[in-house]
């Protein structure tokens, strides 16, 4: 991306030239140049108007009484503003490079009453009055957080269920297409469909739902690798104050959250601070050059994690990692710009307060300016002390992962992020499971040793139980394919996920054995949930629509998830693990309410496990109940472990 100032143009003329535009026809370039040359003349004659104010509203009684309004419209920055509303004070009015923007700093007293605040702007004989709403806070649940007591279900709303076909297509959007036969196009899933499936999730044992972003992505189709693709994934925001109308819009999202809460489920919102879509409304009339990270020529991030934490790293390597664009159509936001920072932070608070969401997942966490992230996290936690924040930092080692969360390491920068996505444990779980039933399972550092070693490094985190654990997601190969479509490994992996420390999260369709590799593209791991669309030939939301093998998997997940939900020891209990021996891996979860023993045989042969070695945790217990089979064990002297099986025992005295 290049920012250019055309000869003879006003210094306020901002022209975004994205990589695709560099190859536009000569005639189009001429028309563009002429329009830019005429802009200063048009600006002098235009009528001043205000077309947007963000945040669109605010609330009385927030812990932070201050809010900064972004006001946009032709000439909006040339007005002198006043506010005459009891309890609302205009502290400062700021202008920036582009005269179409003003930034108004307001302080809202706790005594202010809800109502319509008039933002009055004057310039010469012209006076404008823009209404802006101040609301009363309600007492509906919000910011409840997710904890180790929860089981999160991650789904892509476009691929989960379609409850309202009337919102599948809109002619006024840049991408008016919907075609389920094309894996790269939108498929029509929406919030109405998701709401209809809440009983399904409740029955499965899920306690929280995380959707990939639902905010507006009014992006055109983009050419990626020679194929035209839609922004169905949601990571290219074009307006942070509107839920995409193909999902149902703001009203549908608010209704969905309320219905989820009524069903006893929490809602996680997927946030993106690092970038926006290149057709975001602000980018069509940029406030200032420094709103984005700008380069002389298009510069993409290296996607390398090491320069951020490397004490020996060159500054240019750090800058490319952090300030390079993620892809050409997702411009990189400059969070060191205070106006950008305020805009993003206030939108985060607005979403929690307006929609009532409970937790905050942050996309591409490691690519953000980390002091900004600390400021944003602190602002959310100040308003909602119980809210949980967990970011995506796709790293390969524990030290780098700890850098982005509250940790015990003497880093020069200290993160205040409460949680994070545990990519290190995901890698360890998959590595261990792939070697189940092979000679490597009994090796020095093979099989369950991968898992043991990952958990053995938990000392670097202030609280590892706040990390979100998972086996796959929308960017990775599906779990079942990673483990060779092996149901024994599948059950062992889910057993580990739902009984070890952390906040377990499962990707949609795992419970019905959906599988695929990201080959040739990630669309293969984002297929529609069968039965989510009217007229689907199969309905996997029902037992009758599933195969016997799929029902076996579903019932297994349900039993394990229900046990996890109902037993505090798996939420708050301590973890003690024993070094794996001969492919046998044992750990305990324990607290004052009970003790659970998980014994895994990762070899391809049945094994007898003497338990004397585990006396530190098992002493005093004489019998047990097998959580997964219901079988009662009258003695704990030895355990019989079938091949490729994890046994979950509730110890009894």
Where does each model-flagged region fall?
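Short, low-complexity intrinsically disordered segments enriched in A/P/G/S/L with frequent Arg
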Residues: 7-10
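Sec-dependent N-terminal signal peptides
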Residues: 32-41
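Beta-strand/beta-sandwich contexts
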Residues: 46-78, 133-138, 143
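Immunoglobulin-like IPT/TIG beta-sandwich domains and homologous Ig-like subdomains
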Residues: 62-125
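Carbohydrate-interacting/catalytic domains
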Residues: 128, 137-151, 202, 512-653
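Substrate-binding/active-site clefts of carbohydrate-active enzymes
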Residues: 160-354, 373-383, 388, 393, ...
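Active-site-proximal helices and loops of the catalytic beta/alpha 8
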Residues: 275, 349, 353-462, 485-487, ...
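Active-site clefts of carbohydrate-active enzymes
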Residues: 464-485
